[in-house]
A protein has these predicted regions:
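Conserved small-residue
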Residues: 1-180
């Protein structure tokens, strides 16, 4: 925290801290051999500590997430991956945030998930997928099984931990991104 002890500074400090975490979707373009940011592009957006994020999967609305169906913010983002339907995944590496930051209404169970954002839909929802588990997510790799289901491999960044594998019940639908 950057809190100095002066309560008058607290709202601005809180805003700045929340804006400094998370990730960004940016449009870059190669011009004359150099990669450049396309300023003011409709696809550019931030996912920070204040962004509303939808919870999906079996923990949504349960006591495991304090009854939440939506949480605010993404923290401790590490690596991620790309889905078969060309959205981006970002992994929240840590699961214990609430008291460490001193942010009101931020509870630990809202962090430690895999987050999905569609870089081609600037107005689309950001989602945290509870079906992929809650732990110190390091990364994801996605593949399709021979019978068409989606497999997500995930590493745990905590010391002496595991490698996880999620297999979907339904098959991958290449013509309907929302069905995946």
């Amino acid at each position: 925290s950057t809190f100095t002890g002066n309560l008058a500074d607290y709202p601005e400090m809180l805003r700045m801290e929340k804006e400094a975490v998370g990730g960004s979707v940016i449009h870059v373009k190669k011009e004359k051999g150099e990669w450049k940011l396309v300023l003011d592009d409709t696809y550019n957006r931030r996912v920070d500590g204040s962004t509303p994020i939808e919870l999906t999967g079996p923990a949504r609305g349960t006591s495991a997430v304090g009854g939440a169906t939506q949480v605010f913010g993404s923290l401790g983002n590490c690596s991620g991956g790309r889905t078969l339907w060309n959205t981006a995944l970002s992994c929240e590496e840590n699961t214990e945030y609430g008291d460490d930051y001193g942010w009101p209404n931020f509870t630990d169970e809202h962090y430690g998930w895999v987050m999905e954002v569609d870089p081609f839909n600037a107005k689309g929802p950001v989602r945290k997928h509870t079906a992929l588990g809650r732990f110190a997510h390091e990364n994801t790799a996605m593949r399709q099984t021979k019978d068409g289901r989606v497999v997500v491999y995930m590493g745990d960044d905590a010391r002496d931990q595991c490698f996880y594998k999620f297999i979907s019940k339904k098959t991958f639908n290449p013509t309907n991104r929302e069905a995946n």
